[in-house]
């Protein structure tokens, strides 16, 4: 990738361009790379690139960097000069006959002579079959060729008044297109609800309609011992952001999978609800490290052990008495 205004032929000599090619930095950030190497105190040889700063851009016309290779100006031909176009002959009058229908009081057709020039002769045009009557655009070109009438039609594109299929149609340019839908949310009664296709937005409730009056007023009832709560619990609304609010797995990945259990003292397994840091309680340190090796003893027989102050989230810190783990301080 080279920068826009510094091309390889525009640098004097080849040593600086060779250094630029071998440079580990980006070609655009060349000057920054040289400055970076200079601040890293690599070699004092890098100072020879300080002359690069005094070189102006080759585009400023006050200090022009001489180029070893002359750049030729591309030949430019103005647009309106025709090439290899035969010069038309003198305009010869051509008489054509058009049949124009008129009102019934006159004879049905009238012969109207129309004089044409070669430059305005009507050219037969080919229109795609699916096209109906379409306005025609006349292209005025600067070339002396006869004016070509181009239909204002793109093949496969039907404007609204031609297709007449309603306002919701978009032109599909030759592609088989179908309307896509949003990802669906399952019924809020089911847990995940495979194979469910509910309405994307449930209908809003209608306002209550007035009811006819009762034929007789209800009889008074004795007061209930527990009156109904004045604020009933609202119905659970379906979650409209179900796809974006769903829980995602942690970017770290799952933690270590360990069978969490205590030594079976009571004769039945107690491994329900045991958190990970209480897994080695009551085990000796060697057996616990066979199961989970990243265990560090922080306190042994009531004496603090010297530890490093680094943070390793997988390391389990533990207190022992007689090499048997009695307390765990968690992961840090």
Swiss-Prot record:
Main location group: virion
Q: Where is the composition biased (Pro residues)?
A: 201-231
Q: Where in the cell is it found?
A: Virion
A GO cellular component term found in this entry reads: virion component
What are the protein's UniProt keywords?
Virion
- Location of region: Disordered: 159-256
Protein name per its UniProtKB record: Uncharacterized protein R610
Query: What is the originating organism of this protein?
Result: Acanthamoeba polyphaga mimivirus
